[in-house]
Design a protein with these regions (language model features):
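Short, Lys/Arg-enriched N-terminal segments with co-localized hydrophobic residues
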Residues: 1-6
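Functionally constrained cores in energy, signaling, and assembly domains
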Residues: 9, 30, 34, 58, ...
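N-terminal first-folded block
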Residues: 9-40
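Generic structural "secondary-structure junction" signal
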Residues: 19, 40, 48, 83-87
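Short, intrinsically disordered low-complexity segments
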Residues: 37-78
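C-terminal structural segments of small proteins and small subunits
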Residues: 67-99
Length: 99
């Protein structure tokens, strides 16, 4: 690994935009720009694979948030998870996010 690079990890990102007229597109684009690959099978949540740290991802997203919005970025791992998703969704997560 070169200096400044970070090993790619999986993160779950969840946000609530609480002001009327919020620009979801800017928040969504900032999340996508932080990711090597991503999926969003939920409202206001993304599972991404990124070579950025949680702090660096947050730094890309927070300029698009208001003070009453909420954001959490949590590192996810491939050894302890569960959910109710379709087979194709699980396949994508296993191969692209955790793979």
């Amino acid at each position: 690994m070169k200096g400044g690079e970070y090993m790619a990890k999986a993160y779950m990102i969840t946000y609530d935009l609480n002001s009327k007229g919020q620009n979801y597109e800017d928040v969504i684009q900032a999340i996508k720009d932080s990711a090597l690959c991503w999926c969003t099978y939920w409202k206001s949540s993304f599972l991404i694979k990124s070579n950025l740290t949680a702090d660096q991802i947050s730094d890309k997203i927070t300029p698009h948030l208001d003070s009453n919005d909420r954001l959490i970025i949590v590192e996810a791992n491939s050894t302890n998870y569960q959910g109710w998703l379709g087979k194709d969704q699980w396949t994508f997560i296993h191969e692209k996010i955790f793979g």
